[in-house]
Every structure is written in structure tokens, then in C-alpha cells.
């Protein structure tokens, strides 16, 4: 059976990095969040994809909110990509498609940024997995893409 390709956006992995940052500050072992544990336990079913956009959002959070040095962030990121054997997208060209989408529907800035993640998932022909329901709902509403999953739907798919 072939693996299901999943694009992991920032909110799918955010907790992992925040836990690592907090553990580093306290000098303790970090707890693996349930989402990440689920991904680890289901590696035989899924192929994972992430991108520079996820990395940038994670890095922004770790630098701004947790004062983590870039070299530490790079190590966290390298471990994350390696553990899940992910394909890493290091560049992507966006175009006027986002303008057309914002003309069609009202959305918050966060949702618009998540459309950039969705565009990468579309190019990779991967399921877009997000805990951000507005992006899922908006993409369905405008008929942009049909491989859209919440984390709960992903869990059901794994069963």
C-alpha cells in the first residue's frame, strides 16, 4: 500500500518546537505533543512534506517569544525533518492567485498566510493537514482543493 502524502503546516508542529524551547530553558527533557507522537507512530502510513514557510513561522516564534538562538533552532529543525523523514521544500514561487482568492472571500491575515502553505501542498499533490479550520473552510468554499484534512480527520484516516 502506498503512503498518503501529507503537508504539515505550522500549527500541526508548533507545539513540538515550543515544548523544545521551554524544556531547553528549564534544562529538562521535552514532552512530545500528542500530534507529533501520532505522526511518529504512523510513519508507515504517511509521507511527510514541510517547507521553508513552516520553518520561518517556527523560527519567528522561537526567536521572538522564546529568545532561542538560530543555531539551536536549526538543530531543532534538522531533527524534526530527519525524524519524520520529510521532504523539505526550500523554495516556492507564489503568484497572483492569492490576490484572486482574497478578492473572492474575506479572511484574516493568518488565513491568507495559510493559503501559501496550501499552494505548496497543491503543488506537491499532498493532503493539506491543518488545525486552522478557517483555511480548510475557505479552501472548500471556493473549491480550490479537495485534499484538505483537520487533525481529527487525519486520525480517522489512519485507522
Where are these regions (language model features)?
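Short, well-structured N-terminal submotif of metal-dependent ribonuclease cores
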Residues: 1-51, 65-74
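Acidic, PIN/NYN-like endoribonuclease modules and their adjacent C-terminal/linker elements
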Residues: 1-7, 25-26, 118-159
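A conserved hydrophobic position in a structured secondary element of the catalytic/binding core
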Residues: 8, 50-53, 94, 130-131
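A generic structural signal for short hydrophobic patches within well-formed alpha-helices
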Residues: 13, 55-58, 135-136, 154
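Residues that scaffold the ATP/ADP-binding catalytic core of kinase and kinase-like folds
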Residues: 15-17, 61, 138-139
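Amphipathic alpha-helical segments within well-ordered protein domains
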Residues: 59-63, 103
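Helix-adjacent hinge/juxtasegments
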Residues: 67-88
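Active-site neighborhoods of divalent-metal-dependent phosphate/nucleic-acid chemistry enzymes
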Residues: 85-137
Amino acid at each position: 500500500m502506498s503512503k498518503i502524502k501529507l503537508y504539515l503546516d505550522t500549527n500541526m508542529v508548533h507545539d513540538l518546537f515550543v515544548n523544545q524551547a521551554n524544556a531547553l530553558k528549564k534544562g529538562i527533557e521535552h514532552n512530545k505533543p500528542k500530534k507529533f507522537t501520532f505522526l511518529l507512530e504512523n510513519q508507515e502510513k504517511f509521507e511527510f512534506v514541510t517547507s521553508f514557510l513552516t520553518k520561518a513561522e517556527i523560527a519567528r516564534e522561537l526567536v521572538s517569544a522564546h529568545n532561542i538562538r538560530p543555531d539551536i533552532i536549526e538543530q531543532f529543525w534538522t531533527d524534526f525533518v530527519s525524524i519524520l523523514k520529510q521532504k523539505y521544500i526550500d523554495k516556492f514561487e507564489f503568484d497572483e492567485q492569492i490576490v484572486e482568492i482574497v478578492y473572492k472571500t474575506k479572511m484574516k491575515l493568518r488565513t491568507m498566510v495559510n493559503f501559501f502553505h496550501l499552494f505548496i501542498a497543491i503543488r506537491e499533490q499532498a493532503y493539506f493537514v491543518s488545525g486552522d479550520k478557517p483555511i480548510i473552510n475557505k479552501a472548500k468554499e471556493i473549491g480550490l482543493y479537495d485534499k484538505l484534512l483537520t487533525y481529527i480527520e487525519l486520525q480517522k484516516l489512519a485507522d
